[in-house]
């Protein structure tokens, strides 16, 4: 197709990676209208805490609120909001605040050097604030500001000046929890972190000044981040803020609903060369980007797509006229580096079962989601489960025995989780050859060579298990096999696939939307016998697996997914850490 076919005049551009609301609205970008939530935020408590995973639109949401409430954007209201929900239903507080926006993401998170960065960022931001609103503040403000040293003193001065001038402030803090990274990556930092967030610590003092400012000119505050740890440490005794992260009213505030994704695709299908129907694109995107639920009451009603990943997909699809070969953008991979820290901490737990190992093998975990908890309590199982949830590693999937049931939301998270799980195995001197894995993956997809592929997995598993006896067992065998198959770019490994006939251990669903020429797909029935089981147990499991594989292969779910590929039914039986059976059911 001619590249010029992809250039369409007057077509709205996609705001991929953009966080400036005015640019989106004034430069003909596509915008999913979330302004209906502004009245709800305004009616909520004045000090609003909100936690969401990275790349879910937090910074853009704050920017929208800044433009809506900033007194300096009053003349631009119709241009920015006129045709949106809030433009038709404005609230009394619109364009009535002096806005102070602090973004901690660019500050050095090292606890031994963060004060300098915090002072510099706050100092620069407060100076800009004073210049911007010079006509609304006393004339001596600029000179007096420069007699104050450090973020704490300058913030105190600022809200006192605004109070004297009869002005009210709206304070926004983005990535307030940036400093938590230090304690996740380095346990030795915990003591220093505790010092800084308790007692007379500098970070604690800054938030104490925020609290004090609420008795002066700080009338509203909106604070966002990705985890509740710092919130609990910094705001114990705050007593003025409310955490709305688990509120059903704000489940759809960030991210896209499927209806919003469909509306976007419908718009671009009318002005771009689409090779798929909207339904087909939804079917491709849904397993990768959907299935986030942020409120127990919303389970079964509405799930959310990761908005950044949707924009990445649609932009690449329009630019190249086909489904992107890499369904995960590189920035997401960088963000998930925190998983390496979490998995390392998970391995240090005193309780018997590794939470992540259980999640991978069982397919779900249960726990009570916490609004917040101190850093010293991260290793409490429920707190760790909550941390995984807030980071976007888990999603609400109903109730189980009176507790919240949580599962891996989608393939983006699953791939990252399995990748870093394998990386922790690498930490124990088990090395995986990338070239060898790539060659075996290609042979599996295009030549039907399943013996070499599963033999390689069994060899790696046996070598690893000999180094870490504690991990022996059915959960480990199943989890390790899943993690290895997740590295295969040609398949979407689905564990415990719910079909009309029951559950299948691993269905290697071919990614035909990307690799249309691949020719083989697989159902893998994986069985495990304990070391001490009698030898005839292996044969019993083999026969059981054959019967199950035959039933699964005949389901509509599998038939629809495999397209024209040849379906292999592979039975694998382990006894302990040794693979005793690996055969195809003919």
Regions picked out by a protein language model, each given a short descriptive name:
Residues 33, 67-131:
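P-loop NTPase motor core
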Residues 157-165, 192-219:
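Substrate-engagement module of ASCE P-loop NTPases
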Residues 172-174, 204-205, 219-226:
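Structural recognition of the conserved hydrophobic beta-strand(s) that form the central parallel beta-sheet
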Residues 230-236, 244-315:
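Amphipathic alpha-helical segments of the small helical/lid subdomains adjacent to P-loop NTPase cores
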Residues 557-586:
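Domain-level recognition of nuclease-like catalytic cores that cleave nucleotide substrates
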């Amino acid at each position: 197709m001619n590249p010029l076919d992809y250039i369409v005049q007057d077509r709205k551009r996609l705001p991929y990676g953009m966080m400036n609301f005015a640019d989106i609205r004034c430069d003909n970008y596509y915008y999913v209208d979330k302004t209906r939530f502004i009245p709800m935020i305004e009616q909520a408590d004045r000090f609003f805490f909100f936690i969401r995973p990275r790349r879910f639109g937090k910074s853009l949401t704050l920017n929208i609120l800044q433009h809506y409430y900033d007194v300096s954007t009053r003349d631009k209201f119709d241009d920015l909001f006129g045709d949106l929900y809030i433009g038709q239903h404005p609230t009394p507080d619109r364009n009535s605040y002096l806005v102070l926006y602090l973004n901690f993401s660019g500050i050095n998170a090292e606890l031994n050097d963060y004060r300098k960065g915090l002072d510099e960022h706050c100092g620069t931001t407060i100076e800009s604030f004073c210049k911007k609103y010079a006509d609304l503040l006393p004339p001596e403000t600029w000179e007096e500001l420069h007699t104050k040293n450090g973020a704490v003193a300058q913030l105190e001065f600022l809200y006192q000046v605004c109070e004297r001038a009869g002005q009210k402030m709206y304070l926004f803090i983005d990535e307030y929890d940036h400093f938590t990274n230090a304690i996740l990556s380095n346990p030795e930092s915990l003591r220093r972190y505790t010092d800084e967030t308790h007692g007379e610590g500098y970070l604690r003092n800054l938030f104490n000044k925020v609290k004090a400012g609420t008795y002066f000119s700080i009338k509203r505050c909106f604070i966002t981040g990705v985890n509740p740890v710092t919130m609990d440490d910094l705001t114990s005794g705050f007593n003025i803020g409310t955490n709305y992260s688990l509120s059903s009213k704000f489940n759809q505030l960030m991210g896209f609903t499927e209806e919003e994704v469909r509306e976007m695709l419908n718009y671009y299908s009318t002005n771009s060369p689409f090779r798929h129907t909207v339904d087909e694109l939804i079917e491709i995107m849904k397993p990768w980007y959907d299935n986030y639920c942020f409120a127990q009451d919303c389970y079964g009603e509405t799930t959310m797509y990761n908005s950044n990943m949707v924009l990445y997909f649609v932009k690449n699809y329009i630019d190249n006229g086909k489904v992107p070969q890499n369904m995960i953008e590189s920035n997401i991979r960088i963000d998930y580096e925190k998983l390496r820290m979490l998995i390392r901490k998970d391995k240090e737990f005193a309780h018997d079962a590794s939470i992540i190992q259980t999640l991978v093998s069982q397919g779900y975990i249960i726990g009570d989601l916490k609004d917040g908890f101190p850093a010293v309590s991260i290793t409490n199982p429920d707190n760790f489960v909550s941390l995984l949830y807030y980071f976007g590693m888990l999603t609400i999937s109903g109730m189980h025995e009176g507790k919240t049931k949580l599962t891996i939301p989608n393939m983006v998270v699953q791939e990252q989780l399995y990748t870093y799980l394998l990386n922790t195995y690498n930490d124990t001197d088990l090395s995986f050859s990338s070239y060898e894995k790539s060659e075996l993956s290609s042979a599996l997809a295009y030549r039907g060579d399943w013996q070499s592929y599963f033999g390689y997995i069994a060899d790696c598993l046996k070598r690893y298990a000999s180094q870490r006896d504690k991990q022996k067992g059915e959960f480990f065998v199943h989890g390790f096999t899943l993690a290895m198959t997740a590295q295969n770019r040609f398949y979407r490994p689905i564990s415990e696939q719910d079909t009309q006939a029951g559950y299948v251990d691993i269905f290697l669903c071919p990614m035909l939307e990307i690799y249309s020429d691949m020719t083989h797909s697989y159902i893998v029935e994986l069985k495990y016998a304990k070391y001490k089981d009698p030898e005839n147990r292996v044969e019993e499991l083999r026969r059981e697996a054959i019967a199950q594989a035959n039933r699964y292969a005949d389901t509509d779910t599998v038939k629809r997914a495999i397209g024209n590929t040849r379906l292999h039914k592979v039975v694998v039986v382990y006894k302990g850490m040794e693979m005793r059976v690996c055969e195809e059911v003919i």
